[in-house]
């Protein structure tokens, strides 16, 4: 008798994706982050669901309802901090996942890469709206500053901002719609993840050598299920350490003050995972230019497949490209640091130089280096 997992219509899909899937034999731990992102998404949906049971999306009671969750709901504080710190780990895994894709040339799998960019934008939008919900000072002013950027769009900008706000300022309608969107987006992200995996399994996974792995494949289970489980344990260890010992390490103290439209905080800044993009936005004096640079800082990933003329897919045997990749990582860390600093010298100048370097590396320096390496390899 044939095994039920190979014949049952539903079990067959799971079997072909997680059990009998032929996987390259040499993929490193950097390939673990896809499954870790799936775990993060699951944790966020479950904790978010329990938070939504006690949260009220109303300007007068939102802050109090979050306080109520932390003080009066059984293990409410755990759920709240698991959700908040889970978002940070989600982005940490996302950045490593995208970095792995750049380093090993995974962007040649165009459909998978482009859906991945859509996923990145969706997760960023979800996280931004989630940060507004506790209705603290940084929630309110963060929402005001970021939504106001849309007013830079010529002709329709102001109308668009007022349409998103549901009024003439960030107020009750804004909070209500942000909660509705924050609730629905993770399910859209889940659907996009399925499509992401569908396209990945069409071509098969990339590997550190960038060569075809067809001659040497191994079944996903038990090899990579075990490996992913170890990664998951380490992720949970890190998440629980953050949640139970340092719950407020990555948060902003200003968000423990209820939102006050009459009192602007001295330094308005988003969560740490948006600081690099925020630094790029602030480094351009023109409002529209800043918005374009902000969007392009992520959208530039979409043109990466067309900017890499390298004959070798991965950077594994290309030391010049490796060197530039790590300069790019250092540059992004610098931008993250600058995004959290006040708008004054020398931070303005450092931010502008780091922004120029970021776009130069992506658009010009790295592609030119690829051509040089091709020449050196006589390809």
UniProtKB/Swiss-Prot annotation:
Organism encoding this protein: Lepilemur aeeclis
Swiss-Prot/TrEMBL keywords: Electron transport, Heme, Iron, Membrane, Metal-binding, Mitochondrion, Mitochondrion inner membrane, Respiratory chain, Transmembrane, Transmembrane helix, Transport, Ubiquinone
Function comment: Component of the ubiquinol-cytochrome c reductase complex (complex III or cytochrome b-c1 complex) that is part of the mitochondrial respiratory chain. The b-c1 complex mediates electron transfer from ubiquinol to cytochrome c. Contributes to the generation of a proton gradient across the mitochondrial membrane that is then used for ATP synthesis.
Domain of life: Eukaryota
Classification via CDD domains: cytochrome_b_C (cd00290), Cytochrome_b_N (cd00284)
Database matches in SUPFAM superfamilies: a domain/subunit of cytochrome bc1 complex (Ubiquinol-cytochrome c reductase), Transmembrane di-heme cytochromes
Protein name per its UniProtKB record: Cytochrome b
Binding-site positions, heme b b566: 97, 196
């Amino acid at each position: 008798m044939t095994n039920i997992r190979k014949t049952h219509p539903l079990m067959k899909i799971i079997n072909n994706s997680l059990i009998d899937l032929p996987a390259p034999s040499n993929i490193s731990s950097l390939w673990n982050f896809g499954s870790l992102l799936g775990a993060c998404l699951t944790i966020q949906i479950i904790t978010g669901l329990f938070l939504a049971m006690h949260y009220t999306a109303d300007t007068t009671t939102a802050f109090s309802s979050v306080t109520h969750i932390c003080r009066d709901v059984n293990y409410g504080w755990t759920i709240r901090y698991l959700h908040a710190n889970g978002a940070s780990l989600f982005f940490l895994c996302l950045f490593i996942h995208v970095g792995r894709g750049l380093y090993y040339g995974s962007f040649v799998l165009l459909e998978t890469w482009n859906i991945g960019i859509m996923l990145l934008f969706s997760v960023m939008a979800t996280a931004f709206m989630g940060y507004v919900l506790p209705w603290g000072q940084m929630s309110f002013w963060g929402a005001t500053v970021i939504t106001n950027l849309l007013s830079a769009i010529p002709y329709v900008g102001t109308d668009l901002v007022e349409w998103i706000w549901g009024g003439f300022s960030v107020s009750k309608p804004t909070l209500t719609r942000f909660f509705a969107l924050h609730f629905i987006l993770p399910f859209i992200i889940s659907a996009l993840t399925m499509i992401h995996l569908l396209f990945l399994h069409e071509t098969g996974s990339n590997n550190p050598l960038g060569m075809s792995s067809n001659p040497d494949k191994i079944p996903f289970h038990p090899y990579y299920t075990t490996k992913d489980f170890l990664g998951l344990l380490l992720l949970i260890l890190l998440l629980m350490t953050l949640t139970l010992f340092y719950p407020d390490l990555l948060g902003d103290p200003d968000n423990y003050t209820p939102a006050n439209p009459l009192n602007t905080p001295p330094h308005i800044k988003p969560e740490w995972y948006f600081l690099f993009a925020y630094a790029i936005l602030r480094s351009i004096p023109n409002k529209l230019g800043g918005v374009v640079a902000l969007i392009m800082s992520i959208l530039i990933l979409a043109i990466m497949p067309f900017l890499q003329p390298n004959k070798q897919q991965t950077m594994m045997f290309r030391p010049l490209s490796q060197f530039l990749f790590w300069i790019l990582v250092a540059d992004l860390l610098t931008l993250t640091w600058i995004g959290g600093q006040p708008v004054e010298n020398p931070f303005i100048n450092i931010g502008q130089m780091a922004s120029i370097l970021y776009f130069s590396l992506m658009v010009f320096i790295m592609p030119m280096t690829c051509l040089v390496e091709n020449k050196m390899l006589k390809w």
